[in-house]
């Protein structure tokens, strides 16, 4: 490919709405263009990277016996209603009606479609296990699309689904996917973590995420340096002990707290620490209101709440709903005298004489005690684990980091097969629901994650495995006939040998070419310039300042050998150490 023909419009200036390095460099490097918030066009360079990522993923899927299919993006609501997720999935689901007023969704995932497909085709345990996958566009109506490709409304994903006659068979496939995903990460050349994760709206009873550490990552990871425990903050358990307070219970008293609503304000006004205040949070779900109680100095983990109550539709009640249904402004809600289901974090159990909302504007109760003053229906671990909390395995203080989730695997069990009546006949002639797993990989976000991992102040540093082109040949003076002739010859020789090579034959300055080469991130650059008078060309790795001079007076043998050596030694990790 010639640069003068390549559609790669680079930008000198950074677009104003850029929030991350990957977003900036992919826009400036001519890889993507924004159509609308969270929606992008992939230009030729971006498409080449995507295809290479897809091929790596496809090769690893085929290696473990998964079979590729392609399912429709447009999905009928009936299937989602069968599984119970039409209402549970939440506002991220893009819903629409056709001209006949029938409900559809632009698929955010395909469990319903694939379960419906298989239940009509597979009848016997002899046909199991079966794993199907696709690489296709997905849609989620993100409330705030951001970070470029990392949180988009339209994105490319590999989703796979496995069907089994036994849990043992699912376990085997699950481990195969763990190994396959690890190989994908290794082929990308990035550092990664495998962490325990929450199942969320997908469901199931076990889940792991494959995460690339990154400062701008939206996955919060807790890990233990001693025993190796790793989990997302949505999943991390708190198994530390809570103090059982021994003080005498004091008489309950309602006190005026004018305009005092937040934990900090209540703490200062009443002269009590936040740990002696209990937050009362009202949520709405399928079964109506539920009040959640947690110590004032802790944060509620919504993912744990939804998992424990088995209701992904749970959301915090709005101030308007609370005022209408309870007659109390937000900030003064409390558990005393309220007839709703109450669930509490274990941190509340050992408290004595604590503060709660007074269920009346500008009031709070002091010296509240459980179970004297109110009843808790269910107790759970609902707190968000943070850095410094004890490891649930060995008790050592946990460390925290951030990461970008690329892969997510789930043991679904019979969640979908039972709901959608997908059965097979086992060896005893009995009808049983399929035991399922599902396995996602974010293809388009992989591109952004790799850039976040491998870059410098000048641009992207692509690993060889997914670089749009491996080599760029820069003719530094297009008015020099010898440089043009030699540059063209090197380009021809490399092309004939199957190298993915670009010839920069534009009538621009050498500095302009160097800046574009660094911004785009070509792994290896060959300079054909002034040193050609001595029969020498220069080779340079993208992340290195060293120029390797190669004599070509007697042909291109030494050049080809040096290029192969550079490719063998090429390691973008050297740029981020």
Curated annotation (Swiss-Prot):
InterPro entries: aa-tRNA-synt_IIb, aa-tRNA-synth_II, aa-tRNA-synth_II/BPL/LPL, Anticodon-bd, Anticodon-bd_dom_sf, Pro-tRNA-ligase_IIa, Pro-tRNA-synth_IIa_bac-type, Pro-tRNA-Synthase_IIa_type1. It comes from the Bacteria. Coiled coil: none annotated. It holds the Pfam family tRNA_edit. CDD domains: ProRS-INS, ProRS_anticodon_short, ProRS_core_prok. Keywords: Aminoacyl-tRNA synthetase, ATP-binding, Cytoplasm, Ligase, Nucleotide-binding, Protein biosynthesis. It catalyses: tRNA(Pro) + L-proline + ATP = L-prolyl-tRNA(Pro) + AMP + diphosphate. It is found in: Cytoplasm. Transmembrane segments: none annotated. GO terms for biological process: prolyl-tRNA aminoacylation. GO terms for cellular component: cytosol. Its EC number is 6.1.1.15. Its main location: cytoplasm. GO terms for molecular function: aminoacyl-tRNA deacylase activity; ATP binding; proline-tRNA ligase activity. Catalyzes the attachment of proline to tRNA(Pro) in a two-step reaction: proline is first activated by ATP to form Pro-AMP and then transferred to the acceptor end of tRNA(Pro). As ProRS can inadvertently accommodate and process non-cognate amino acids such as alanine and cysteine, to avoid such errors it has two additional distinct editing activities against alanine. One activity is designated as 'pretransfer' editing and involves the tRNA(Pro)-independent hydrolysis of activated Ala-AMP. Homodimer. Belongs to the class-II aminoacyl-tRNA synthetase family. ProS type 1 subfamily. Consists of three domains: the N-terminal catalytic domain, the editing domain and the C-terminal anticodon-binding domain. This is Proline--tRNA ligase. It comes from Thermotoga maritima (strain ATCC 43589 / DSM 3109 / JCM 10099 / NBRC 100826 / MSB8). The gene is proS.
């Amino acid at each position: 490919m010639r640069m003068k023909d390549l559609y790669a419009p680079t930008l000198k200036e950074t677009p104003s709405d850029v929030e991350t390095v990957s977003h900036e460099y992919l826009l400036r490097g001519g890889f993507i263009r924004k159509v609308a918030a969270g929606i992008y066009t992939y230009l030729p360079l971006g498409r080449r990277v995507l295809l290479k990522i897809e091929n790596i993923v496809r090769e690893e899927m085929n290696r473990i016996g998964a079979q590729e299919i392609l399912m429709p993006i447009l999905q009928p609501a009936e299937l989602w209603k069968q599984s119970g997720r039409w209402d549970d999935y939440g506002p991220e689901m893009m819903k629409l009606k056709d001209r006949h007023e029938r409900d559809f969704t632009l698929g955010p995932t395909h469990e319903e479609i694939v379960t419906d497909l298989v239940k009509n085709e597979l009848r016997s345990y002899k046909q199991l296990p079966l794993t199907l996958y696709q690489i296709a566009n997905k849609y989620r109506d993100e409330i705030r699309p951001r970070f470029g490709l990392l949180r988009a409304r339209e994105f490319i994903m590999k989703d796979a689904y496995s069907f089994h006659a036994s849990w043992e068979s699912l376990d085997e496939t699950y481990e195969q996917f763990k190994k396959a995903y690890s190989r994908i990460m290794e082929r990308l050349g990035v550092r990664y973590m495998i962490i325990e994760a929450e199942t969320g709206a997908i469901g199931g009873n076990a889940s792991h995420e494959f995460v690339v550490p990154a400062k701008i990552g939206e996955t919060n990871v807790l890990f233990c340096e001693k025993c190796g425990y790793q989990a997302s903050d949505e999943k991390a358990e708190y198994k530390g002990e809570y103090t059982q307070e021994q003080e005498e219970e004091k008489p309950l008293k309602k006190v005026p707290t004018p305009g005092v609503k937040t934990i900090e304000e209540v703490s200062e006004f009443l002269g009590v620490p936040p740990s002696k205040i209990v937050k009362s949070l009202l949520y709405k779900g399928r079964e109506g209101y539920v009040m959640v109680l947690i110590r004032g100095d802790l944060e509620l983990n919504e993912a744990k709440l939804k998992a424990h109550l088995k209701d992904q539709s749970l959301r915090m009640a709005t101030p308007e709903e609370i005022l209408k249904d309870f007659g109390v402004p937000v900030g003064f809600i409390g558990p005393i005298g309220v007839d709703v289901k109450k669930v509490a974090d274990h941190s509340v159990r050992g408290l004595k004489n604590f503060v709660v909302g007074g269920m009346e504007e500008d009031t709070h109760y002091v010296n509240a005690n459980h179970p004297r003053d109110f009843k808790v229906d269910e107790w759970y671990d609902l707190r968000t684990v943070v850095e410094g909390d004890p490891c649930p395995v060995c008790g050592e203080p946990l460390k925290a980091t951030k990461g970008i989730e690329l892969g997510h695997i789930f043991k679904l069990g019979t969640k979908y097969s039972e709901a959608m009546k997908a059965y097979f006949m086992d060896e005893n002639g009995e009808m049983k629901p399929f035991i399922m797993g599902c396995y996602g990989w974010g293809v388009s976000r992989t591109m952004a994650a790799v850039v976040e991992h491998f870059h410098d102040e000048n641009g992207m540093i692509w690993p060889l495995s997914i670089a749009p082109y491996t080599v760029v040949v820069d003719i530094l003076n297009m008015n020099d006939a010898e440089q043009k002739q030699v540059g063209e010859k090197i380009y021809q020789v490399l092309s004939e040998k199957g190298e993915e090579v670009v010839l920069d034959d534009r009538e621009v300055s050498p500095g302009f070419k160097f800046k574009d080469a660094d911004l785009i991130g070509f792994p290896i650059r060959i300079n054909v310039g002034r040193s050609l008078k001595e029969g020498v060309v220069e080779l340079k790795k993208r992340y290195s300042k060293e120029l390797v001079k190669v004599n070509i007076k007697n042909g291109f043998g030494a050049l080809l050998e040096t290029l192969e050596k550079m490719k063998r030694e090429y390691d973008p990790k050297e740029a981020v150490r």
